[in-house]
Amino acid sequence: MIYQERNGNAVAVHQGENKMDIADLDFSHRMDMELSKHSFPYFFQNVLGMMYPKYMEEWLESMETTDRTVIICSRDHGKSVFMHSWVVWNLVFQEPPFQMLYISSNQKQTMVHMREIDRYFNLPQLKHLRPSRGWAIGNIALTNGNSILERSVGSQIRGLHPQEIIIDDPL
């Protein structure tokens, strides 16, 4: 079976005897989103399609049980991917208005992170949260009323009142 995009929806194109229609696919997406509401690991694995190793379980437990979490780990363990996914999950499922702030070492690096976060909203299950007029990469505001702003280390953050701040690669 091949999936194609038509009018913003993923459509199953039938091949052979295995048939699936749009309603089945929509139902599957709705179920994935419903199960994701209360489970970041489910969202990470089943909606975003990522592997969820044991050490990420420890990161999540720390984030859910403390007010401040620092994750120190060598390169290529998925810290940024984990945090981007965490941001997306919160933006999708937190009660609005929920504002996040993403801070990195410099403007260029912060924008790299924000572009990665932006990419997730091209997934069929999340596309409806992207406003028709679009958004600025540095100020992502979803149709559900939640948003994320970017800042670099040393930039002005006075006056902002985000519910969550992510500091990724500050040095």
Question: Can you describe what each PLM-predicted range is?
Answer:
Residues 2-171:
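Phosphate/NTP-binding elements of NTP-utilizing enzymes
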